[in-house]
Amino acid sequence: MALLMSPTECVTEQTIRDNITRAVSDVFATMLGHHPRLLEDQMETSGQSWPPLVARNELAHTPHVVGTVGFIGEANGLIYIYLPDAFARLVTCRLLGLTETELANDGEAVVNDAVGELTNMIVGVFKNCLCDSGYPCRLTIPSILRGNNFHIESTGSAVRRIYYFDCVGHRVVADIMMKIGE
């Protein structure tokens, strides 16, 4: 199923899947030396709230650090990258060359910054793929959410795709909400 036709290229479900898989894989491999594996994906277009992380995941009550970056232009949307808090701390240590003790002394703000930057890189790769397909757009600044067992709802007109990755035994979720041509 395609979102909308463009003079250049159609954005299909497969295109979205390939682009987010490439983005997550490239950023994790380059920045962290990890190679995440896509486990499954799910489509939702009805504007319902986010059940998968809560209802289907054994980590429903695990605290998460969630980075989000938007893109605006010929394609508009948001991408949320969910990391369990413990994995976000490991990623931060690896990304910044810190020990757990150093990170504990520096506090959660450092984890927030690292997850925000990682999310910005992932969404940047995804956005560049959209631009290469004829949908010029630019990024918004990263934001961070922290918590557990919460819901994010999409608007009724947005197409939503949710992708689950395994990265060294940790679940990473990419939640994409987007519209083309508005």
Predicted feature descriptions by range:
Residues 1-182:
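N-terminal auxiliary interaction/assembly segments of multi-subunit proteins
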